[in-house]
Amino acid sequence: MANHRMSEATNHNHNHHLPYSLIHGLNNNHPSSGFINQDGSSSFDFGELEEAIVLQGVKYRNEEAKPPLLGGGGGATTLEMFPSWPIRTHQTLPTESSKSGGESSDSGSANFSGKAESQQPESPMSSKHHLMLQPHHNNMANSSSTSGLPSTSRTLAPPKPSEDKRKATTSGKQLDAKTLRRLAQNREAARKSRLRKKAYVQQLESSRIKLSQLEQELQRARSQGLFMGGCGPPGPNITSGAAIFDMEYGRWLEDDNRHMSEIRTGLQAHLSDNDLRLIVDGYIAHFDEIFRLKAVAAKADVFHLIIGTWMSPAERCFIWMAGFRPSDLIKILVSQMDLLTEQQLMGIYSLQHSSQQAEEALSQGLEQLQQSLIDTLAASPVIDGMQQMAVALGKISNLEGFIRQADNLRQQTVHQLRRILTVRQAARCFLVIGEYYGRLRALSSLWLSRPRETLMSDETSCQTTTDLQIVQSSRNHFSNF
Amino acid sequence: MQYQTESWGSYKMSSLGFGGLGMVADTGLLRIESLASESAVVIFSVSTCCMCHAVKGLFRGMGVSPAVHELDLHPYGGDIQRALIRLLGCSGSSSPGSLPVVFIGGKLVGAMDRVMASHINGSLVPLLKDAGALWL
């Protein structure tokens, strides 16, 4: 028994060492494909990887086809002429049928030769197998000949029963060196194909992972594009706070459109002042909402707000402290509002004046902030760099205060306009402002979606336009169609 | 002298409508009171604070020259700042404890947001005129 195991072990070793030397040899002159082409029909003209699958499939099909094969071999396929199969059928004959079920495809052959070895002492058994195999192979040969295989396959089949050296010696037959070599080659071809299959499966697996990663990236990009609402290219390192704000802002813009159409229809339908007041109050509450959202976003990512990445490019052109200039509102209105009383006009001009003064004051403050940031960062660190950075960070955190004050100023300006004007005038005023910003955003998308040729021909604009914007513009351009 | 200031201060407090605060008046609050009444427009500021710079700019832009007390340079700055925080906390400011704090005519206006809001709604200029800081 110990001897058996020893022989098994050595045989395993032998089998493990053998493939690599052989694989190289086989790879060089492709004998396995030669075998297939020789034994099978000419239809087996596959690439290297497909070959592995074909061989695998053959193996499964062989196992499936076993019962009828043993029963007479009438249904034997031509592929079973593949020289390695006799060994397998030998192994899976009735006495071993229970084992054959558990034999997996991958390590089958390596185990298999070991088992064949262990069976070796039972010489009567193996000789019996030989006897049983003999007619079976003849059958196969016959069936293959009927299916139009080359005659070489038939000549190959008969010597197969003497495939094992030791079996041959026990049964007292002469061993055919050529057949042995061919069988060894077959085994190695099978092993090689298994290795190829393994590599192929691994390759498939890694491709699958890569694909799912790409899909995730696409999903992310798509959702960000949705958040941006075409307001600009999504930044590569957008913070979560900024992304949330962009999403909220997109929703707010939708609400804004809804409010605008509400005001428009309200004005056209000549609603009563009370009904119109409800609509205008609703709009002011909606307007206050954006300042609440901005206050949250300024805490999360002050830079995202202050440079206006969330705005459309044309809006960004007019940016002042993360938003519009309050005095700009009045500039928009003055030409559009008519039927104002003298008192109302005075109120509006006074509002324009005070908002400009407040803007100027905040701008001075921000200038001072920038100056002190310059002074802090330009100075060589007195104690250590970290302290310097801490001071600079503290200054940057003041930016949030300026955004809050500027938003406060914007909010107060809108509320003051509402106080100065009658309900109907206020509705008209907010419609004018809303339409103005709507047009500004439309201008942005028009600018972004202008034909590429313009970009290419206009050299100066090419220099100032980043690649991202070009990509963005082409994307918008296509989406318009 | 000390007694005199205190009685004068608490009197002014109640007259300004600080109410309960006057009853628990501490030295910081008294100092604020005395400083605030020294000029038509008084700004409590920190010399390095940019928002303080902004509010000073606002008044100067309007033609008002406010009395500015830089608390980081003031001997009792810490006391005064703590008292201001308590004062703003009571006045319901949206950003309690933030400098600058503005007094006009000895009355508390508030921090930056209150000053801006009252300027936009048109109440700041009348207040300044009443305090004698503006003539036009």
Swiss-Prot record, chain A:
Composition bias, Polar residues: 110-126
InterPro entries for the chain: bZIP (IPR004827), bZIP_sf (IPR046347), TGA_domain (IPR025422)
Region listing for Disordered, in residue ranges: 91-181
Chain ranges of the bZIP domain: 176-220
Cellular compartment(s): Nucleus
Induction, per UniProt: Induced by flg22 in leaves.
GO CC aspect terms: nucleus
KO phenotype (gene knockout): In the double mutant tga9 tga10, reduced male fertility due to defects in male gametogenesis, with early steps in anther development blocked in adaxial lobes and later steps affected in abaxial lobes. Microspore development in abaxial anther lobes leads to the production of inviable pollen grains contained within nondehiscent anthers. In addition, multiple defects in the anther dehiscence program are observed, including abnormal stability and lignification of the middle layer and defects in septum and stomium function. Reduced SPL levels in anthers.
Region feature (Leucine-zipper): 204-218
Compositional bias of kind Low complexity: 97-109, 143-155
Reported tissue expression: Mostly expressed in stems, inflorescence apex and flowers, and, to a lower extent, in seedlings, leaves and siliques.
Region annotation (Basic motif) ranges: 178-198
Motif Nuclear localization signal per UniProt: ranges: 165-172
Record keywords, A-Z: Activator, DNA-binding, Nucleus, Transcription, Transcription regulation
Residue stretches making up the DOG1 domain: 242-450
GO molecular function: DNA-binding transcription factor activity; protein homodimerization activity; transcription cis-regulatory region binding
One Gene Ontology term from the biological process aspect of the record: response to molecule of bacterial origin
Gene3D superfamilies per record: 1.20.5.170
Subcellular location, principal: nucleus
Subunit structure: Homodimer. Binds DNA as a dimer. Interacts with floral glutaredoxins GRXC7/ROXY1 and GRXC8/ROXY2 in the nucleus. Interacts with TGA1, TGA2, TGA3, TGA4, TGA5, TGA6, TGA7, TGA10 and PAN.
Function: Together with TGA10, basic leucine-zipper transcription factor required for anther development, probably via the activation of SPL expression in anthers and via the regulation of genes with functions in early and middle tapetal development. Required for signaling responses to pathogen-associated molecular patterns (PAMPs) such as flg22 that involves chloroplastic reactive oxygen species (ROS) production and subsequent expression of H(2)O(2)-responsive genes.
Family that this chain belongs to: Belongs to the bZIP family.
Name assigned to this protein: Transcription factor TGA9
Source species: Arabidopsis thaliana (Mouse-ear cress)
Higher taxonomy: Eukaryota, Viridiplantae, Streptophyta, Embryophyta, Tracheophyta
UniProtKB/Swiss-Prot annotation, chain B:
Effect of residue 52 to S: No effect on the function during petal development
Source organism of the structure: Arabidopsis thaliana (Mouse-ear cress)
Tissue specificity remark: Highly expressed in inflorescences, roots, and siliques. Expressed at lower levels in mature flowers.
Keyword Disulfide bond among record annotations: yes
Any Gene Ontology CC annotation: nucleus
Motif annotated as Responsive for interaction with TGA factors, chain positions: 133-136
Gene3D superfamilies named in the record: Glutaredoxin
Impact noted for substituting residue 110 to A: Affects glutathione binding
Domain Glutaredoxin: 29-135
Quaternary context: Interacts with TGA2, TGA3, TGA7 and PAN. Interacts with TGA9 and TGA10 in the nucleus.
Compartments, as annotated in UniProt: Cytoplasm; Nucleus
Top-level taxon: Eukaryota
Disruption phenotype: Plants show a reduced number of petal primordia and abnormalities during further petal development. Defection in sporogenous cell formation in adaxial anther lobes when associated with the disruption of GRXC8/ROXY2 leading to fertility defects.
Gene: GRXC7
GO BP: any one term: petal formation
InterPro entries noted in UniProt: GlrX-like_pln_2, Glutaredoxin, Thioredoxin-like_sf
Family, similarity comment: Belongs to the glutaredoxin family. CC-type subfamily.
Main localisation: cytoplasm
This protein's UniProt keywords: Cytoplasm, Disulfide bond, Electron transport, Nucleus, Redox-active center, Transport
CDD domains: GRX_GRXh_1_2_like (cd03419)
Cysteines paired by S-S bonds: 49-52
Name of protein: Glutaredoxin-C7
